[in-house]
């Protein structure tokens, strides 16, 4: 910004370091200038990625939206959003911001003296299906421990399966969740909160319609999984839908008949 006023003022909307350049010109048109680098320094508040002066739940939602590619944070926003100081932006950062908002954490950044290990095993089960069926594909977690943040990618073949509903499960009750269908057959999700008092539960339940022309097999995959700030798992879990002829009518007889039981086990002479 520039001004020709003798007394000027300017409001800086974003944190950072700003140079000031002063140019003086006399009545004969002769001018001279001086540059004062980083003269104005607007401080940052850890966790305040929205630049509104406070760290709050809205900032946590912006972190999650960045992780699922709904929004893109600037390098400076990523730096101050990294409240765990691990040099990355993660669902755990969003969890710490939420915990700070409700008073569970006294200050940001937050680097606990003892870091609790976080883990969990993800499970999916194979199933049989045929065209026209609706199938439920739950993704569960077992042996969960200190899962305060979770992100992943769900993929499936949209030429075979049409997504009917996606419902996040009871394990994520109370979590802040963001999701984004980045393209047909691909969904990113990220969740932050405090793990409930359970080691097992449903993360998400997907309901698909099996499209016409399905005669082989198709898979649904949970990939790029990261719990808190653990190393990312390339494949968290995977299931296969196999074609099974007539499965929708299995176990439902169309014709009933009653025949003589011979020989009768209770009276062998009966015919």
Residue ranges with predicted function:
Residues 1-11:
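Surface-exposed, flexible coil segments in extracellular/virion-facing regions
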Residues 3, 29-33:
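A structural signal for beta-strand boundary/capping segments at domain termini and interdomain linkers
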Residues 13-16, 213-214:
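Surface-exposed, short loops/turns at beta-strand junctions within beta-sandwich domains
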Residues 32-39, 237-238:
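Edge beta-strands of extracellular beta-sandwich domains
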Residues 44-45, 50, 95-260:
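Acidic, low-complexity intrinsically disordered segments
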Residues 45-50, 78-86:
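Acidic, divalent-cation-chelating loop motifs in proteins
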Residues 51-74, 86-110:
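Alpha-helical segments with a strong preference for the paired helices of cellulosomal dockerin domains
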């Amino acid at each position: 910004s520039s001004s020709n006023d003798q007394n000027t003022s300017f409001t800086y909307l974003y944190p950072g370091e700003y140079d000031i350049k002063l140019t003086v010109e006399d009545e004969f048109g002769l001018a001279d200038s001086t540059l004062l680098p980083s003269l104005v320094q607007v401080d940052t508040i850890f966790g305040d990625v929205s630049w509104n002066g406070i760290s709050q739940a809205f900032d946590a939602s912006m972190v999650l939206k960045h992780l699922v590619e709904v929004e893109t944070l600037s390098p400076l926003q990523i730096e101050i959003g990294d409240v765990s100081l691990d040099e990355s932006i993660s669902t755990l950062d969003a969890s710490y911001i939420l915990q700070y908002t409700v008073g569970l954490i006294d200050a940001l950044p937050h680097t606990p003296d003892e870091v609790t290990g976080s883990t969990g095993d993800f499970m999916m089960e194979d199933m049989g299906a045929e065209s026209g069926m609706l199938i439920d594909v739950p993704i569960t977690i077992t042996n969960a421990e200190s899962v305060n943040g979770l992100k992943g990618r769900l993929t499936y073949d949209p030429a075979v399966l049409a997504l009917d509903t996606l419902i996040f499960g009871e394990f994520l009750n109370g979590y802040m969740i963001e999701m984004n269908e980045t393209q047909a057959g691909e969904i990113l999700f990220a969740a932050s909160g405090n793990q409930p008092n359970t080691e097992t539960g449903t993360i998400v339940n997907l309901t698909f319609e099996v499209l016409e022309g399905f005669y082989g097999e198709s898979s649904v995959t949970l990939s790029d999984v990261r719990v808190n700030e653990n190393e990312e798992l390339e494949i968290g879990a995977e299931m296969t839908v196999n074609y099974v002829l007539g499965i929708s009518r299995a176990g439902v007889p169309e014709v009933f008949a009653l025949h003589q039981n011979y020989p009768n086990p209770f009276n062998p002479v009966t015919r």
